[in-house]
Amino acid sequence: MIETESTGLLTLYSDVRAAAVHWLWYPFIASGKITLLQGDPGDGKSTMMMRLIAELSTGGATPNGCPLGRPQRIIYQCSEDGVADTIKPRLEQCGADCRNVAFINEEVYGGLTLDDERIRQAMMEFRPKLVVIDPIQAYL
């Protein structure tokens, strides 16, 4: 064994207490963590997220059948589709409770970037269980 001490810059992993991961959708989306959903255009990434949002907003189940519990709030921020003609109809078609799904209106408040204070403010006020940024490249 190598003898060493923790310094101000480094922490030894032996000094870290392991913690359990809490899952929103096991084993795909961990609660409180950043998860990237990647795929080619047309693979169904947005459709899958819409279905998960719908289930989460109504307290349904994950795509693999795990119950989600009580209805939760979600922020779905999308730059590629129209809110009224595409996003809301898709949410309704998936059975979402749109009273639990919100977005920052970029037409009213201007464009967003990932480091925008308005995202943090929206999260503090709305307290979502899930925040979806679709696609992330549009907000870099």
Q: Model regions: which residues?
A:
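Conserved inter-motif catalytic segment of the P-loop NTP-binding fold
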Residues: E3, L10, A19-A20, L24-Y26, ...
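Alpha-helical interaction segments
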Residues: Y13-D15
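Walker A (P-loop) ATP-phosphate-binding motif of ABC ATPase nucleotide-binding domains
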Residues: I34
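Residues at the beta-strand->loop junction immediately N-terminal to the Walker
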Residues: Q38
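Hydrophobic positions on the alpha1 helix immediately C-terminal to the Walker A/P-loop
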Residues: M48, L52
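Gly/Ala-rich phosphate-binding loop of Rossmann-like dinucleotide-binding domains
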Residues: S57
